[in-house]
Amino acid sequence: MTGFTGSAGNLLVTKQDARLFVDSRYYLQAEQQIAGSGILLMKEGLPGVPSLSQFILETLPGQTLGLDGRCVSLDQAKAWAKAVTVVDVDLISPLWQDRPALFTGAAFRLADHLAGRTAQDKLRDLRSQLKAAGAKAMLLTDLMDCAWLLNIRGQDIPHTPVVRMFVLAEAESLFLFMEDKAAAPIQAYLKELGAEIRPYDAVYAFLSRYGAGDTLLVTPSLSFALGQPLLERGVQLTESAWSARSRNFKTPGELKAIREAHIKDGVVMTRFLRWVKEQGGTGLDEAGAAARLDQMRLAAGCSDISFTTISAYGPNAALPHYSAPAQGSAKLEKKGLYLVDSGGQWPGATTDITRTVAMGPLTRAEKAHCTLVVRAMLALMDAAFPRGMDGSHVDVFARRPLWAAGLNYGHGTGHGVGAMLSVHEGPARINYGQQNTLPFQPGIVISDEPGLYFEGDHGVRMENLVECVELPTGMLGFVPLTMAPIDRDVLDPALMEPIDIRRLDAYHALVYDALSPYLHGEDLDYLENATQAL
């Protein structure tokens, strides 16, 4: 409809105009991609720019709002219904007649030692939730919840190993709504769980078994298409975040797999960083660099990348979620900054790492900004804080060095990460602008990724995944999971405090100890040099 290829955005079309609403990650990208289309760009978060919800509530009262109820949550639709009449209608399918069919791949069982808990154990916990709430069933609609609960993974969504399905669990029954092609390889296992397989689209009619007086536990992402008919029949819907919160706290088995995967991922990244720093001026472009890194991960035993690799040179790195075109992407030169944000799906684990490296000489501003971002990442990684604090509180550890310099960035500092699931896993997050997120507890895996972006010039981001742990003092803190060198060529030590240098040296000592047994020749030489004390 728009030509915008970002992963998040909303299009509102009225008789008068069309407006694309995006957050700060996509301001520049959306501006470029819809230029000349006549579509108005709404940069949510900027002063004076209403959010999509504000715009609907303030400018469309009394009107009728059509939406695809499968793609909008019940909560969101109910909020809009205070001002407009909401109608569930699919207006896109009649227009998009050559739309590719949804892909269905074979599902597979995740080994119990990787999951750390059996599906039977999780189902017992789920049913205890039903009993406590006096509910007849729990309906899971989030694909990550479904995969986590059943200890299965799939191939239905690019780079996110989930199965397209719904799970409906009652006290004595378990119904899975999924395609036969996906279920076939694990039929025997699903039978062990007592599951009855139904067609994916049959869920809408099947839910008619519930009526007035029944209570269903539902996930916060329940769609309008599923939830509204239940409400109209008098079913009591009670939101439950049990599954999402449970999978945020990784089991010992999951953490073991995650730590092992980060060693393998770090070996790949170190080999790539050595190679790419030698490619300035050779004709290598952003797309070619990304392809090389993706191939290296797959060759090392990764089943898939965890998201489309962000490979950005020079001014393109100022777009936080830049996507290099397959043809005609920028060539890496012997100067300036190159940013690569990438990750993989390893057995039982998902990785996500960003490094910004010097391809040659840097300007004073580029070095200053890189130094600030590294200081920010290390400060959060070394933070100590009491129990009860969430991501809106600890964000200040990362942003303080930047704020002191009069700088900031528009995206969150951290997002939860799944265990061979989605690279973005809620409700854990680090963002001072989002209150009441999941309080930190040991076992949460989250990213630490501050950045700075200067339109038309350069961008910097550094990212490690970290694990929340209890410190010897009894406070909570983080330990790094990501193991890969931070390019010292981007740093100006004169702009670092002694504590910053100690933190960097300590991290690099960990990286060397973790990776050196698995690297040889030029790669080991590079690691030794890259992790020398500053």
What are these regions (language model features)?
Residues 1-534:
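Active-site neighborhoods and metal-handling regions in enzymes and metal-associated proteins
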